[in-house]
Amino acid sequence: MATNRRVSRVAELIKREVSQMLLNGIKDDRVGTGMVSVTDVDVSGDLQHAKIYVSIYGTDEAKVETMAGLKSATGYVRSELGARVRLRRTPEVIFLEDRSIERGNKVLALLSQLNHDRPPENLLAVEDNTDEDDESFSE
């Protein structure tokens, strides 16, 4: 078993190398239909498996096509990792779509909507109470 420090260093190295491959190495047209970025890499403790989380910007169809292209390119990505990274064994690569950015945007939109729907009277009542409290302290 590798130490946590080594696992995190290998994960960062894989993230950097796969990002470079997405820019220059993968020639599959399906991968280019959506803008792809590597958001995170989880490497198992024995360094045998790497889950690569990707964020894809584009339509739902482009996301499906891009994921299909990435899944078909896993063999290429693994062999390139073996050539670029010095490890005893090259980890198995699994691409997973990261939807955390979409979920974050939805949460921000909901919070903005709640803030917008709040009646202004509540805000004025709070402000009036603070002014009265301030006067009582100055006496």
Swiss-Prot record:
Coiled coil regions, renumbered to chain: none
Pfam families: RBFA
GO cellular component: cytosol
Spans through the membrane: none
Keywords recorded for this protein, A-Z: Cytoplasm, Ribosome biogenesis
PROSITE patterns: RBFA
Subunit structure: Monomer. Binds 30S ribosomal subunits, but not 50S ribosomal subunits or 70S ribosomes.
Protein name (database record): Ribosome-binding factor A
Organism (species): Nostoc punctiforme (strain ATCC 29133 / PCC 73102)
Taxonomy of the source species: Bacteria, Bacillati, Cyanobacteriota, Cyanophyceae, Nostocales
Name of the gene: rbfA
